[in-house]
Regions:
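Flexible, glycine-rich phosphate/dinucleotide-binding loops
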Residues: 12, 35, 84, 91, ...
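Redox-cofactor binding/interface segments in oxidoreductases and associated redox assembly factors
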Residues: 43, 77, 168
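Hydrophobic anchor at the start of a short beta-strand
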Residues: 26-27, 75, 165
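N-terminal beta1-alpha1 cap of cysteine-dependent amidohydrolase-like domains
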Residues: 1-69, 178-190
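Cofactor-binding loop segments of dinucleotide-utilizing enzymes, especially the Rossmann-like FAD-
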Residues: 8, 80, 170
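Short coil/turn connectors at secondary-structure junctions
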Residues: 38, 71-73, 95-96, 129-130, ...
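Amide-donor transfer/coupling interface in amidating biosynthetic enzymes
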Residues: 107-190
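Cysteine-nucleophile active-site neighborhood
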Residues: 48-122
Length: 190
């Protein structure tokens, strides 16, 4: 089992370390050829505009869409990665995006850097709360058909799944808790 971490920008190293802590082969993905043999891909937090522009420039977005459409790839976007996965980015209609999930996301919905916070979340499928880190986090404002809400922060949607796609507003890689990474590996395993 090999999981790729989109390594164009952002906190990809932390995701890679979480996967390696689980004994999973983790590879950095910068070009379409790096997707060879990869069963799952994590798109990290960082700057969603930069991630989108670089992924388009390198042809990664199209390669990822093709692999997903063929049933060969699970994809998880965290924070900026979740924004990149959305079909709609509220207020930024021209921002480059992967656009795989029928969700509408609002960037920086919780405010600026100084308004970042940590919170224990009840996440569907986990036996105890998950300590989530929200840094200039987006909110999933609308979900389309077939999208399941896995977690909320108050009344705000912060974690969703559709088929083999995940999008989370928070940074699970900054917690030391590998439970979500382990679940994603199982999702990618199919």
């Amino acid at each position: 089992m090999k999981i790729g971490v989109l390594a164009l920008q952002g906190d990809f190293r932390e995701h890679k370390q979480m996967l390696e802590a689980l004994g999973v082969e983790a590879v950095e993905v910068r070009l379409p050829k790096h997707l060879t043999g990869v069963h799952g891909l994590i798109a990290p937090g960082g700057e969603s505009t930069t991630i989108g522009k670089l992924a388009a420039e390198y042809g990664l977005d199209e390669a990822i869409r093709e692999r997903y459409a063929c049933g060969e790839l699970a994809v998880w976007g965290t924070c900026a990665g979740a924004i990149w996965m959305a079909q709609e980015i509220i207020g930024y209609p021209d921002q480059p995006r992967l656009g795989l999930m029928p969700i509408a996301v609002r960037r920086n919905a919780y405010g600026r850097q100084v308004e970042s916070f940590e919170e224990d979340l009840e996440i569907q499928g986990l036996d105890r709360p998950f300590h989530a880190v929200f840094i200039r986090a987006p909110v999933i404002e609308r979900v389309g058909e077939g999208v399941e809400v896995l977690a909320r922060h108050g009344d705000r949607v912060v974690f969703v799944q559709q088929d083999r796609l995940w999008a989370s507003s928070f940074h699970p890689e900054l917690t030391g808790d590998t439970r979500l990474h382990a679940r994603f590996v199982e999702l990618a395993r199919g």
